[in-house]
């Protein structure tokens, strides 16, 4: 039965995680006092209940491999620094007991959310870590994440103007009317720049057409790219769950939305 098989898998993962955690905790703290034991028991039971033993094992494994490969690894950022389990595993290098950091900011049984460990590798060593992950899990189960660049008003005007063969001077003049603010849409731009709105009713038919088609193209995908950091590891071939592409400059396959 699939659900039983998954439960057994999580149980095995948890036993190994628990073993590694206590092994690491003894290296970090020496003798484990009542405070540390209580904290470890609470964190491990939360991780088991939320079904994340496998996640911790994967992160532990590639960080361990990175250090063995001589790759510089950051001390850990964000809420993961509040986990004694993560500290014991060597995922982070900040002692949550010493600095009184809260585990609940990382994982909270009352607020179901995915764990997020921010891991930093040196720029030169990142490729070595990726290579290790691909070798371990297989190239069909590891992929980077595609990104989509969409048409903003300024770019839409310039692209349409070029196709419409509108003179470059006019194209530049109109596009400069768009406010230089992040997240600007045509709707917002028309409110802030009435002179841009007036171009819709221009006496020049090429300008009217340019404005019309630029508005229609706003938000359309203009180009694709690869996420700077994100990597997906699947328990099965990723093509079973999402479309896969081969990016020109990517080190791996890239996956569309999952």
Where are these regions (language model features)?
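Alpha-helical scaffold/interaction cores of sigma-54-like transcription cofactors
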Residues: 1-258
């Amino acid at each position: 039965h699939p659900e039983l098989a998954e439960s057994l898998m999580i149980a095995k993962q948890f036993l190994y995680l628990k073993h590694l955690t206590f092994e690491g905790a003894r290296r970090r703290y020496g003798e484990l006092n009542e405070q540390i034991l209580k904290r470890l028991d609470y964190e491990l039971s939360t991780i088991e209940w939320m079904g994340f033993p496998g996640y911790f094992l994967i992160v532990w494994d590639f960080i361990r491999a990175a250090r063995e490969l001589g790759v510089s690894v950051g001390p850990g950022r964000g809420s993961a620094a509040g986990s004694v389990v993560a500290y014991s595993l060597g995922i982070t290098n900040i002692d949550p007991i010493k600095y009184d950091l809260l585990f609940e900011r990382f994982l909270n049984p009352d607020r179901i959310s995915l764990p997020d460990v921010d891991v930093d590798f040196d720029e030169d060593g990142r490729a070595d870590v990726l290579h290790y992950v691909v070798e371990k899990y297989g190239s069909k189960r590891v992929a980077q994440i595609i990104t989509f660049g969409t048409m903003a008003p300024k770019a839409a005007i310039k692209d349409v103007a070029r196709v419409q063969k509108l003179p470059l001077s006019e194209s530049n003049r109109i596009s400069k009317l768009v406010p230089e603010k992040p997240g600007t849409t045509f709707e917002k731009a028309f409110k802030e720049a009435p002179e841009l709105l007036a171009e819709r009713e221009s006496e020049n038919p090429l300008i009217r057409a340019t404005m019309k088609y630029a508005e229609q193209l706003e938000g359309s995908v203009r180009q694709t790219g690869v996420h700077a950091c994100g990597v997906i590891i699947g328990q099965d071939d990723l093509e079973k769950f999402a479309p896969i592409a081969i990016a020109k400059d990517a080190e791996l396959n890239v996956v569309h939305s999952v």
